[in-house]
Amino acid sequence: MKEMTLKHTREIDIFYNEHRKKCTNCGHAFIDGACAHLGYLKDRQYAVLCDECSHLLDETVVRYHWQEREYEEPLPDDMLWRYMDLSKFISMISRNDLYFAAANTFEDIFEGAKGIIDKKSDWDNFYLDFFQKAILTAPGQDISKLTIEKLKTDSERLLNELNASGEINRKSTFISCWHMNNYESEAMWKMYSKDVTNAIAIQTTSGHLYEALYKEPCIKIGKVKYIDFKKRFSSLNGAFWYKRKSFEYENEVRAIIQKHNVNEKGIYISVDIDKLIDRIYVSPYAPEWFVDVVKSVVEKYKINIPVLHSQMLEKPFY
């Protein structure tokens, strides 16, 4: 078996993200626990190969212990919406970037939560037992030299480090939130713009969002799962993909990036505006002159994207 070179490039990491589900040679689907071999063929083409095909690699960059992702990826054509006021829209198109807010700045105090406080003892007991077993079965561990007190101290230390990482991750996880829907949402108009008469919505797709973010390998795009925290925990490594059932109406897709040692309320990520935005909708509660204002702003920044007044303005008959 070839040694790993660990010579990652942005391009090969993008390739892995886009082809990670099955062997690119035989089509064998990877399952949890399988080994995925990422590297170069003799013609220097990228490949992700299973064990049986791994001999075809001329260079092995890395071997992954394959696992299903913590989140469900939306389909490339799934329609996404982001509602905002005009000032935020102008900021986005003038700077050519997208704002990602730190998880600890969200109003929802359950962002990144593992569970409810009443269930914390169950969580702690599970991982305390997990760490004790891991210490006892660690390669090279001499059990005869391991005292009960040492086992207890080390496992409690690991548990404390795990618990401390929760708040650290809330500060180092940055999120851009999107609403997945084939249609406009009146609730979203009212909830996610400060002044509904001064609001717009940009429409895109999951695939266009991915392309607009330059396929950045560090950014993950996935659907939020809505759970009852009284019945279950979220996830050790994927807590930011879970929200309470009471938020299910949001039907949220989010883009997430981890940035450590960044003590900011949010960060700006470069984005290709022309690839990002398919259409711009103006609030149904906005006056007609405001539509003209939005059109003039779009024209000023030389953005060739349709500006439409909300479809919710259509008149009924009885």
PLM regions: where:
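Non-catalytic N-terminal targeting/anchoring module and adjacent flexible stem/linker
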Residues: 1, 12, 22-26
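Short Cys/His-rich Zn2+-coordinating modules
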Residues: 2-15, 31-37, 239
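Generic marker of residues within folded, mature protein domains
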Residues: 13-16, 39-43, 192, 245, ...
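Short recognition patches in nucleic-acid-associated and regulatory proteins
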Residues: 17-44
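Generic recognition of cysteine residues
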Residues: 23-26, 35, 50-53, 177, ...
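Cysteine-rich micro-motifs
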Residues: 43-56
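Partner-binding and oligomerization surfaces adjacent to conserved cores of proteins
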Residues: 58-318
